[in-house]
Amino acid sequence: MKRRSDALLGSFQATNVTPPSDNSNSTAGGANGSNSGTPTSTSGKKRNKLIKSCGFCRRRKLRCDQQKPMCSTCISRNLTTCQYAEEFNKNIEKKATYGPYPNADLLKKVEELENKIRILEAEKNTNSSASSMYTSPNFPPLGTSVGRGSTETSSPLPDGVINPYADRYYLQSKHSGRSTLYGPTSMRTQIANSNWGFIEKYKQLWAKVKVERNKWKQNNQKTMCRELGLLDESDWQPDPLIKQICRFLPSYNKALSILDDFFNDGACNEINVILDKAKVRRDFLDYFMPEKEVKAEGDRSIVYILSNPKKNYYKAAVILLILCLKYFHTDVPTPIEKFFTLLKGASTAKVFYIERAQMLILFYYHRETYSFGGDGSDLVNINECLVTTVTTIGLHLNIRETFKEHEVFMGSIESLENVWLMAIFIDYNISCNVGRPLLINKFYLDENQDHCILNSKSKTYEGKLKRYLKLTRPMLLTLYDRDKFPDLKAYSKRIINFVEEELGPLGHYTGENISEEVPLRESRILSMAVGLLLSFYALIHSVLKVRNIESKNNTFQLVLINFSIIVNTTIRCYRIDKALYPEKFEASNPHLPPHMALSMSLTAGLFSKTLVFFCSLIYFKLTLFENGLCLSNDMEVGWSDLTKLTVPLDKDLSLGTAMSLYSSIFDRLFTVGNKELIRTMHRSSQFVIELAIERTYRTILGNVIEFRKLTEETWLAQIKQELDPQSDNPSSEAKIVSDRQRDLSLAVPTPTPSIIPMLPSPGETKNHAKSQSEIIQMLTDEFWANYNSGWEELINQSEFSTLFDDYKDN
């Protein structure tokens, strides 16, 4: 009994594990002082050389390009497998890792067992799932983990599959019959294909939160079905739609002043470049008719909106959208909504004006700023209409040559080039957020052509945006090409290099006091880069099964950087508006100040993508008990540095550190300006929903942390009592557990998982294997029993309305 207790306790004790370094050839017990064992040989150190080529190329002495999961040699020979040797873990002695068995046999056995577990987990999840979701059939959901000593092992690909990402999808099917398809770069697809259990808990909790959300939306008259709701509204107005619109417009001089401000406002400089100021002003004077009688204050009302003989109302639509951005904000009058809906849906060939493209871009920008849906799916139709319009007009041609004689009625060449650039930018955003192939393909945009708009060496914001799109568009095109294998790890390195070379020190964006030297608009490019990088990390994690310490560290690092960018951009925009427009913060103003509204657009889509992946990944780790995983070994917050996109190989970003930073970063929103920032942001329905989702996720994580720690500490107390019944009083041990549990809060981090290899003597191997299996199963059963019971209590007793009014002073 004493020996068994020693073995059990050993499985829960921490070891000093340091991430493997590519720059070191030392074995465990060397310079790092590892406790994993002592050398078994008295001879000199033996160099452990990593074999980088695959087995096929090595046996036939062929040159291997080392691509994973399959090298080009194996692909060209139509081989079904391409195996690489496992990377040697330099911190654990080889004998302790592999034992007396040959490495190749052990790897083969591990692969067989992992495949069996995946099949069983897939069957289990299929039988137990009642939700209406459909995921990629060729790639079963992830149901297990890979041990800490592993590096990267790819699941066997189906015969003939070269690109394992192209057909990775998630079909969301509502009970109403509405369906939405998401592709590989969408976080919905990533989580649905992973089956980590987090989403099921989220659905249960969100069902409760949604009741309060709907009440809040009803009280504040917020809806995402504005366009469809227009069909239900009665219209007893005898006047035509144009005259109805005029009743809501500002005075003639006021409207003209708003147009001038739009082109002079720094918060709108990013979008006004698609317009020719002189042409827009001329269109206003030509088509917006004021009344003849001048009022006492010297101004006149707008009484009618004209069009040209060909009914080009898109000129008026551009001006009305400027008024929506600068005057109406979220409160767009119903007649104007109807006007936009009619113009967007027109199917005749008589609508292909440059003003139609400009209207669609402005409409996209307005919706992204004031009513973004979280994942961009509500903008898909706008993007498709826009791409059709710009390519039908011919903006993909050499603009300076094709339209040099058309500036009088189409606007300046520079504005036309910017319309084309914004169409490329919007197409990229939809592709990344929703997971759809680019609509602007290589036929329309070939970087090898001299007139390609993305060929720029300018150091301006526009130049950097063009170079970023030139870098990443080919990556997305390859991602959806079934005949090519996208090297996502190489793509990730190129994106990281771009950020470091083009956007300046990362600390300027992640520090609490964001540098004023950084142009605000460059936060958009950075948000795009880290968003795509996160999608690649997620695919590498789930498809290629890369689970080493370096991958874990860099994933957590990227997530925390993303959170910092979002929060710091919001705070910076708040401070700019506070200095320039203090009157915008008065309680009587129902709209966001201009720069704070801009912040919603600068980071649109990044928040939901980062949050759902981070919380799902942590939930997965917290609910895993295999391989002696014990979270209670490391309670301290360790190393952290958010000034680089990658973590040094000699550092470890623990789970506890990640949780602590995550909480502290978001909690900053509630302290700036004595809660003035959070009160102001509650004018945005998008922000309110995102904040409620974040609090819901944090509630789930806090709940699972609570019961995970309770389970581990209870078992540790029992093991210690069994080892030495006289040393500890069971009641005092239980009291310690209870006290620690009571002090737990959602902001307190959970420790980094540690996997402790067990090395019993040969005579004990069988009994030890049985005892460790039993203890893991007992821990698992006790955790889930307590967790499910506590979860039901949380669901039934929690007050969720506070998620929507927590900005108020207590």
Swiss-Prot record:
Residues 1-47, 722-742 are annotated as: Disordered. It comes from Saccharomyces cerevisiae (strain ATCC 204508 / S288c). GO terms for cellular component: cytoplasm; nucleus. The lineage of its organism: Eukaryota, Fungi, Dikarya, Ascomycota, Saccharomycotina. The keyword DNA-binding applies. Residues 23-43 have a biased composition (Low complexity). The gene is YRR1. This is Zinc finger transcription factor YRR1. Residues 12-22 have a biased composition (Polar residues). Keywords: Activator, Cytoplasm, DNA-binding, Metal-binding, Nucleus, Transcription, Transcription regulation, Zinc. SUPFAM superfamilies: Zn2/Cys6 DNA-binding domain (SSF57701). GO terms for biological process: cellular response to oxidative stress; positive regulation of transcription by RNA polymerase II; regulation of transcription by RNA polymerase II. Pfam families: Zn_clus.
